[in-house]
């Protein structure tokens, strides 16, 4: 049986480096590839993903990527074999004004300053890999076109509240959070798992918003266990 495709969508300002270790850890089970959608709203991002995706696939994402992945699962339930969400709660933006300001900074020439500001809180101070993860985030962010980041940030700022829609996601789902996530509280992941009929919640200690960089082995272990459960049932 051919290995299923697994689409991975990075967090805001991130690229394939976010998933380098994860892709290596899952290569014997799936065909992973990173996709950065083009769009300034979640529906446009979803349309871009579905246009490029195979007929059937697994999908996952971190933060911005997790929001897009969840929207894809809602938009095309017949095509999605499994969903992985990392650090992306189901609510609307808690501070839309802050989101608007972030896009203004990006479009106003403060790309570097914004990325460095985000880096200050994106990892856990308790993470052994936190300092390295922070520097990787900065390198990714500075290498990403600021307009691309701004468009994705626009999509996040106006995203809808999805708490009432989660029960419609029936595919096997992994909800993985860092306990020290300061962008998306881990309690949101636990609450999502209670609302989704086929979801498991995994919380990682001493990890912030970027588990794939801060705790690559623990993240890979959780992901492989989830994937093997899916593949056994195929």
Regions found by a protein language model. Give the residues of each.
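Conserved HGGG/HGGXW glycine-rich cap/lid loop of the alpha/beta-hydrolase fold
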Residues: 1-43, 48, 62
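Flexible "cap/lid" loop of the alpha/beta hydrolase fold
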Residues: 74-75, 79-115
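Catalytic histidine-centered segment of alpha/beta-hydrolase-like enzymes
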Residues: 207-220
């Amino acid at each position: 049986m051919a290995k299923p495709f697994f689409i991975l969508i990075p967090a805001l300002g991130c690229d394939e480096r976010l998933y380098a270790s994860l892709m290596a850890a899952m290569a014997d089970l799936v065909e992973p590839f990173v996709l950065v959608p083009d769009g300034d709203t979640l529906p446009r991002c979803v349309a871009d993903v579905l246009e490029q995706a195979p007929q059937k696939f697994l999908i996952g994402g971190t933060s911005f990527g997790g929001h897009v992945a969840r929207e894809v699962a809602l938009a095309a339930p017949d095509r999605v074999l499994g969903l992985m969400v990392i650090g992306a709660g189901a609510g609307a933006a808690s501070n839309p004004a802050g989101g608007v300001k972030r896009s203004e900074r990006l479009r106003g020439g403060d790309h570097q300053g914004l990325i460095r500001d985000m880096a200050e809180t994106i990892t856990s101070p308790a993470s052994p890999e936190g300092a390295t993860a922070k520097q990787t985030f900065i390198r990714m962010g500075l290498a990403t076109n600021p307009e691309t980041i701004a468009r994705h940030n626009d999509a996040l700022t106006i995203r809808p509240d999805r708490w009432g829609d989660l029960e419609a996601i029936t595919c096997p789902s992994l909800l993985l959070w860092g306990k020290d996530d300061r962008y998306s509280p881990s309690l949101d992941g636990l609450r999502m798992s209670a609302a989704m009929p086929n979801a498991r919640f995994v919380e990682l200690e001493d990890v912030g918003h970027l588990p794939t960089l801060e705790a690559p082995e623990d993240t890979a272990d959780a992901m492989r266990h989830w994937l093997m459960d899916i593949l056994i049932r195929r």
